[in-house]
Amino acid sequence: MSKKLKAAIIGPGNIGTDLVMKMLRSEWIEPVWMVGIDPESDGLKRAREFGLKTTAEGVDGLLPHVLEDDIRIAFDATSAYVHAENSRKLNELGVLMVDLTPAAIGPYCVPPVNLKQHVGTLEMNVNMVTCGGQATIPMVAAVSRVQPVAYGEIVATVSSRSIGPGTRKNIDEFTRTTAGAIEQVGGAKEGKAIIVVNPAEPPLMMRDTIHCLTETEPDQDAITASVHAMIAEVQKYVPGYRLKNGPVFDGNRVSIFMEVEGLGDYLPKYAGNLDIMTAAALRTGEMFAEEIASGTIQLPRREAALA
């Protein structure tokens, strides 16, 4: 029996296509289905070229095939507005859901900070926050594990060309979801998130600024060491995650300046915001697959599959 979990990707846009390209190299996840709503979409055509089965009838077009193709995990890269219904339909069939939209109906997952907690409990839906969240929350957590953080603020700057229509429709959800995760995962008592979409040509690489206000005077050596250790953890799945400057200390304010370069799988390397999202989502799926293969956690039983 293959150790790979068979996967469906919902949403054939920038994120979904990049995810497929990464999955094709994965030892733990096998992409089988790509789900879209437009029969003419480039993303569905590309998925077929990669050898995936496709449907243009949304998740409803996938449901009849879930059991026969043994789909065990789905990655939703559509929109916050449709995710809840997609997740409900697939969870009912025993499919784990990794949510790459800002819907956040499941618990937030930022792999280097809290992935292990989720895997131990087999959450049926985990939310990958946002690209800005994946890039910045590890840094907030790096500070808050040293000493309490009263306030965390992040500014994610991404190139206009790297974000598709789904992300543009979800800007408000992006800021709310990221701010919530700065608090719940990052450990700040209060969080704020800002996204800047830069139309400059040639496109600029993703840049992220993280400001933390500590409750007491910052322990500069301990925070600096913690930040560097956390960067090394993120680089295990996003090699282009780099410290540009910092940590810079000004009174109780700690400022960290990051740059994220992508692998250039689907979009060029400037779209590090895509890469950090898809790489984190795949890392999450792979961790579930590893734990299932080792017998640490059990997949839900499927009555129909046993009949």
From Swiss-Prot:
This is Acetaldehyde dehydrogenase. It holds the Pfam family AcetDehyd-dimer. It comes from Stutzerimonas stutzeri. The active site is at residue 131. NAD(+) binds at residues 162-170, 273. Keywords: Aromatic hydrocarbons catabolism, NAD, Oxidoreductase. One of its GO terms (biological process) is catabolic process. GO terms for molecular function: acetaldehyde dehydrogenase (acetylating) activity; NAD binding. Belongs to the acetaldehyde dehydrogenase family. Gene3D superfamilies: Dihydrodipicolinate Reductase, domain 2, NAD(P)-binding Rossmann-like Domain. The gene is nahO. NCBIfam families: ac_ald_DH_ac (TIGR03215), PRK08300.1 (NF006157). Its EC number is 1.2.1.10.
